[in-house]
Amino acid sequence: MKIEAVIFDMDGVIINSEPFWVEAELEVYGKYGLKMTEEMCNQMKGTRIEDVVNHWHSLFQWTEPSQKVIINEILEKVIYNIKERGKAMPGLLGLLEYLQDSKIKIGLATSSLYCIVDAVMDKLQIAGYFTGINSAESEKLGKPAPDVYLGAAKKIGVNPRKCLAVEDSYTGLLSAKAAGMFTIAMPEKSEYNLEKYNIAHLKIKSLKEIIELDYQGKLNLVNNIPVEK
């Protein structure tokens, strides 16, 4: 089956923003006396921010400030860091051009809110490449439920089984696989060898590898048949 669309996760896949979330969460939680660690924050990678804050509230049961206040403060800091320090992940622009030239539709399926998406698109100037953008903000359930990816496929008008999803988080991979998509995992360097990422059909270290994988016949972006798993 020919792949007709590539749907990207956002944070940690198209932009180097994953550390911004950890920094913001540690700073905001610490401000209100909540003792969090980087490892704790990373456990929730790929999860939408309201679900993250709700998870920690269920454990720590703080009374003030409200979850909404904490969410807004985290979002403000992440947006600031995207504007000041955000960079495209290596190989992104070349891959977007390759997909566009090959008439492959490009989508986005992210746990981040649309305000974060807007900041990323503005910083990287890549909005014109995307046929459809879907945030968990639009869905009843966030990742690992399939809703975000199914919604993205619907927006770009492609059967989910003809979509390739690129993810950096285990939570995101579960979402894309539940949606029936061919999956590529791109974990951060420190997590690359973790067994959990083997649920993906393929695993890469950089977006630069996707074009080469297509040339090698391991994808079906142009003329090849993807490896079944």
Label each PLM-derived region with a short phrase.
Residues 1-4, 97-100, 113-229:
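Asp-based, Mg2+/Mn2+-dependent phosphohydrolase catalytic module
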Residues 80-108, 114, 118:
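Short, acidic loop-to-helix structural element flanking the phosphoryl-transfer center
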